Each structure stands twice: as C-alpha cells, then as structure tokens.
C-alpha cells in the first residue's frame, strides 16, 4: 500500500481521548466512512490483496468489522459471515469465550456459517487490533467450523499492545496502519 493512502487514512480517523474510559485514545473510523472516495480506495486496496487467494468468505467481527467485511466481500464476490456478541445471532451457534481486562466475554458464529462446507478459505477482518482477545476467539470459531483462516486483516494495529504479536503466532496478520 502506498504511503499517500496510509497518510490519507490516518488523517481521516478521529481520535477521541478518554473513550470508552479514562486513559484510552479511541480510534474512531466512522469519520473515514464519511469520505466515499477514500473508503473505496481502502476496499480496492484490500480487494487487490485478496483477489488471487481464492477466498470463499470474509468473516467480520462485530461491529466495525461488519462495515469493512461486507464491503470487501461484495468487492470480491464472496460470502460474508458475522461474528457477534453472545445472544445476537438467531439460529444455532458456536460460542467462544475470551478474557477482558476485568472478566470475560463471549462471541458466537452460526454453526452453519460456511454452509457446511469443510476447508473453506476465509479472511478475518476488523477495524482495530488491540489485545487480540476477540480476534483469537474468532480464530477458534473459524477453526471449529473446519475452515482455514488465510489471514487476519485490520485497518489499525496498536503496536503498544500485545495483539499483533499474539495473532502473528497463530495466523498471518496484516495491519494497514500501525499506530
């Protein structure tokens, strides 16, 4: 990806201090979505990255991974599969717990998300990689459905947190922007 696009993306992302709690500098991608030409460039860049890899599905993590993932799935002409917080999917699901700073949470995927096809090739996508807990739990769900995660893709990877390193130990990991 060219440096000009990286700079444009960085400039389009709003930073909100002390959100959702004191001491956090939140990276708000909703401002990027206000620039359709830039958003198109982003999706086109990702499309070029994955077009020749014979991807069957894009798996998006709730909630901003849905935005990036569905646009990328459309661009690639492949299916989109949501990974959601526990209790948000209507049919039979598989669930995976993961640790939070104080406690734990769970995410789910429909048990028939890949239409029962074993060995499908997927890309996991979300807007931001911080500690890696949600992404690692998502990888476990993908594996449980006997799919192969080709790469985990994030718009932003936070270098000062362990997520990038933890994920790279499990799957090829790509962060467009490292902050």
Curated annotation (Swiss-Prot):
Organism: Helicobacter pylori (strain ATCC 700392 / 26695)
Family recorded in the similarity comment: Belongs to the purine/pyrimidine phosphoribosyltransferase family.
Subunit structure: Homodimer.
Predominant subcellular localization, coarse grouping: cytoplasm
Keywords annotated in UniProt: Cytoplasm, Glycosyltransferase, Purine salvage, Transferase
HAMAP family linked: Aden_phosphoribosyltr (MF_00004)
Enzyme Commission number(s) from the entry: 2.4.2.7
PROSITE patterns per record: PUR_PYR_PR_TRANSFER
Stated role: Catalyzes a salvage reaction resulting in the formation of AMP, that is energically less costly than de novo synthesis.
Subcellular localization, as worded in the UniProt entry: Cytoplasm
Catalysis: reaction(s): AMP + diphosphate = 5-phospho-alpha-D-ribose 1-diphosphate + adenine
Pathway the protein acts in: Purine metabolism; AMP biosynthesis via salvage pathway; AMP from adenine: step 1/1
BP GO annotations: adenine salvage; AMP salvage; purine ribonucleoside salvage
GO cellular component: cytoplasm
GO molecular function: adenine binding; adenine phosphoribosyltransferase activity; AMP binding
Full protein name: Adenine phosphoribosyltransferase
Pfam family, one: Pribosyltran
Primary enzyme class: transferase
Gene from which the chain derives: apt
